[in-house]
Amino acid sequence: MGSLRLSTVAIAVVVCLSILLISPTEVDGRQVCDYDKGECNSYEKSSTCIEPCKQLDSKFIGGRCIPVGGITGMGLCVCCRDVQRGAEKESM
């Protein structure tokens, strides 16, 4: 019973730290991937997050699946936006 509780806590800590480390994630210095779209399977192609993110809002230019579950294949789908494009829209 105690080892089950300890492993549950360990998994929760790993997931939380992974989320903190990837949020926000910069890609090529122009894109920021900081909107959590939900869970994804990190073993599948990363393109599984691209279309759902683009359909969510026009400010998103894509998305990617970031592994957070280690060997379980659990991932976090994050949507990416162009920082320059977002700044231009806000100034209008």
Swiss-Prot record:
Record's GO cellular component terms: extracellular region
Pfam name, any one: AtDEF-like
Locations listed in the record: Secreted
The keyword Secreted is annotated on this UniProt entry: yes
Superkingdom field: Eukaryota
Gene Ontology BP terms: defense response to fungus; killing of cells of another organism
Leader sequence residues: 1-29
Disulfide bonds: C33-C80, C40-C65, C49-C77, C53-C79
Keywords, in A-Z order: Antimicrobial, Disulfide bond, Fungicide, Plant defense, Secreted, Signal
Protein family per UniProt: Belongs to the DEFL family.
Record protein name field: Defensin-like protein 96
Organism: Arabidopsis thaliana (Mouse-ear cress)
